[in-house]
Each structure stands twice: as structure tokens, then as C-alpha cells.
Amino acid sequence: MAKNRRDRGTDLPGDGDQKISTGPEIVSVTVHPSPNLAAAAKPVQGDIWASLLESSPWSANQGGLVETAQPPSAPIRSQDPVPVADLVNRWSQPIWRTAPLAGNAESSEEGVVAPSLTQSDSVLAVSDLVIDVQPETDAEVEVSIEPEPALVEPVIEIEAEAAEVEPEPAPVADLVNRWAQPIWRTAPLAGNAESSEEGVVAPSLTQSDSVLAVSDLVIDVQPEANAEVEVSIEPEPALVEPVIEIEAEAAEVEPEPAPVEPVIEIEAEAAEVEPEPAPVEPVIEIEAEAAEVEPEPAPVEPAIEIEAIRVELEPVLIDEVVELVTEFEYSQAESVASADLIANPAPAESSRLAELLDEAAAIAAPAVAVAVEATRQPNKITASVKKRAPVQEVPVEDLLGGIFGVAGSAVRGVFTIGGGFVDGVVKGGRLVGSNVVAGTRRLAQTIEVSCGSCSSPKCDAEDKNK
């Protein structure tokens, strides 16, 4: 353990070839005590109150004065006191200039980092001086100071990281600062150059490395004039410095994981947008044969008997026409949404439709008017039938011809109306539908007004007018 010490006295300034032995050294110290060391007279407790009562205007003269016997004060000496700093400066410097140890060079070559000495290792505190003042004359006092036993510090092995030892700051008196400064002005050690070349950290010598605690000194001082004090100071044994082994490998620091940014995968295919369903226009298929529409039962179905031939007129075709008209009026509201796409029909087409409607009205048979009147005014027809007692004679040929003519005109009228409706649906024209409705109404009006091409001379004029 002694090999870990570093040479600390080879290049100190002012040493020369001086070698200090390890044995005790006796130093003669002359101390001139200051007059302040004498015990000062303390005031008696009653004096303060007595003085206050004396100065008070409300107290009687000499009422609270208490005479106390004060101890005689120590004689004041004319000699100037010698500060303790001068005393310490005379014997402190040769103590710290110790001989270098041979083991420091070997420890620096082996790559071991020597610990740095702190102020708390060898601080001599002046506050621990115990000075006994005795009134004897011409006395020689020998003071022997025994150092504390050496502290063996443990060997610290640090594998991952070097331990950071924070020294505890020791209070340094102002008196020590006055004489401690020339001690620290030492020359650099010879072992530092070798350790720096080999990559070994050399210990730094701070002010606290070689401060001798004055608190360990016990000095008996006699206040007599020309007193000679002999102080023998034995230096403390060398402290065994700890060997700190630091591995070359530094602790592996795990880096913090980098924040992983979320990766958003965007598919190349665009989202399939479902188109809105287009408004489906109703398509009405008109067959060649008339659609069978079940009409609402009329309250009274007229039965006309002509010469033992019973002819029952069924208002099927007229009801179909009426229902188509209502369907056209209902679909008129649905065709408003497609009004922007409707082109105005050509005048030739509208005139053609009007001509077809006029032809259908002219071809209509008088039996259609009878059927319409029977469906619209059943009560009147039944009343008129009841009034006619004699049965009119109608030729069978005229009757059959009229029936077939009415049926053919009705079929043609249905075809024309269906064709106009289909044209209106295909073209999406609202005007075409209105023209169809108007033509149907005109057809009904013409049937009601005139019987058309009826060749029967024995027709009841009153019924026709009705």
C-alpha cells in the first residue's frame, strides 16, 4: 500500500537538499501573550438596574444604588502581542516538506489513478490550540504533539464507472489562510509527465492536500516576559492512499429508442363511389288488345232490349280512357324532375298529335256517347228507359255496323293515346303529356256533343242532347 504514494517533495522551491527525518523535531517558540487573555471583569447583575434607577426622574436619589465589590482588573502590559500566525509560520513549513516515496513512480507506470487528497486529510485547525497562561517567569515549556494514528483507507475497485468522491469542505480559519499560501506554491511533480504520456489521469494537488490541522496542537503558553516555548511536533505518518482500479471499458449506454412514426398505407385503388340511382321512368307497354280493366260496378247497369235482341253495353273502353287520363295527370307531377332535359317538341309533332286526336273523335260511334251517358248519369238513363214503353225498332245491320265502328275507333284511339304517351316518356316532355290529356278531353267532349257518323234515322234526339 505504501507504493501508491506519489513523490511530493522533490521539486519543492526552497528545499534544496534538505531531508527531514521521521523523528520528532523540537521547535523553540517565543509567545508574548496579549493583555486580552486576562479575565475581564463582568458587571454584577444589580449595577445595570441601579444605574437605570439613578437616571430615572421618578426614583429617589440614591434609592436603588447597590454598592458591589468589583474584582481588581489585571495589570495592562505595554508589550505588543505576538499573533499566533507568526508562531505557526515558523514551524509549519518544514513539516509539510516531506521526502518523496519510491512507490509513486511505480503506481503511475502501472496505469493506476491515484486519488486526489482533499482538504479534510491533513488540516491543522488553529481552533484546537489550548493555551495555558501561567504567571511564572523565565520558564521553558516543552510541548510534544503526538499525531493521530494513520487511517488505512480501503481499496475501492470500480468496474463500470469511476466513483465521484465529493470531499466534505472543512472550515479554514482566516489565520490559516495567511500562512498556508506559500505552502501550495509547489513545483509540478516529476511523475505527472510520465502519467500524462501513458494516458493515466494524474491526481491534482489541491490546497487541501497538505494542510496540517492546528486543532491537534496543544500549546502551553506562559504570559511572562521573554518566555521561551519549545514545541516538538511529530509529523503524522503517511496515509495509505486507496488504490482505485478503473476498467478501460466505459459503461454501455443504451440509446433511447427512436420514436417510430406510424406508417399509413394508402391503397392505390380509389374508393368505389356508388352512383345515385337514376330516376326510372315508367315504361308502359300497350298491347294491341285493350287492357282488361275491371271498372267499378255501376249502381244501375242499363239493359236495352231491341226487338228481342238484348244488347248489353259495357263501358270498358271509356273507363280505360278515364283511367289513362288520371294516370297522365298523376305522372305529370313525377315528370317535373326531368323538366331540364326535356326539349321543346317540334311544331310538326304537336300538330300531328292534334290531327290524330281529331280523327279519333270523328270516327267515334254514337254508342260511345250512350255508354258515357249511362256511366255518368245512371239515374237519368234508368228513368228515361222506364218512361219509354214502346220498343223502337232498329235494324240489325245498322246495329252491328255501329258496334264494330265504335270498337275500331276505340282501339285506334287507344293506340294513338298510347303512342303519344310513349313519345312523351321517351322524350321526357311535360308538354307532350299535357297535350295528350288535352286531346283526350277534347275527344270526350266531341263524343258528348255529337254522335259522329251515325246512320240510324230512328235515334232518340232527347237522349243524345242529354
UniProtKB/Swiss-Prot annotation:
Region Not required to restore magnetic response to deletion mutant: start-end pairs: 1-24, 81-256, 136-334, 333-374, 432-466
Cystine residue pairs: none
Ranges where the record places region Disordered: 1-23, 60-80
Alphabetized UniProt keyword annotations: Biomineralization, Magnetosome, Repeat
GO biological process, one term: magnetosome assembly
Changes seen on gene knockout: Single gene deletion has compact clusters of magnetosomes instead of magnetosome chains; precursor magnetosome vesicles and vesicles containing immature crystals are throughout the cytoplasm and no longer associated with filaments. Cells have substantially decreased magnetic orientation. No change in location of MamK. Single deletion slows recovery of MamK dynamics following photobleaching. Deletion of 3 consecutive genes (mamJ, mamK, mamL) leads to cells devoid of magnetosomes or a magnetic response.
Subcellular location: Magnetosome
Region (Required to restore magnetic response to deletion mutant): 25-80, 375-432, 426-466
PTM statement from Swiss-Prot or TrEMBL: Identified by N-terminal sequencing of a protein that is about 96 kDa in size. The protein runs anomalously on protein gels.
GO CC aspect terms: magnetosome
Swiss-Prot/TrEMBL induction comment: Part of the probable 17 gene mamAB operon.
Role according to the record: Required for assembly of magnetosome chains. Regulates the dynamic behavior of MamK filaments. May connect magnetosomes to MamK filaments. Moves from the cell poles towards midcell; movement does not depend on the treadmilling ability of MamK, suggesting MamJ associates and disassociates continuously from the MamK filament.
Subunit structure, interactors included: Forms homooligomers. Interacts with MamK.
Protein name, entry field: Magnetosome-associated protein MamJ
Organism: Magnetospirillum gryphiswaldense (strain DSM 6361 / JCM 21280 / NBRC 15271 / MSR-1)
Lineage: Bacteria, Pseudomonadati, Pseudomonadota, Alphaproteobacteria, Rhodospirillales
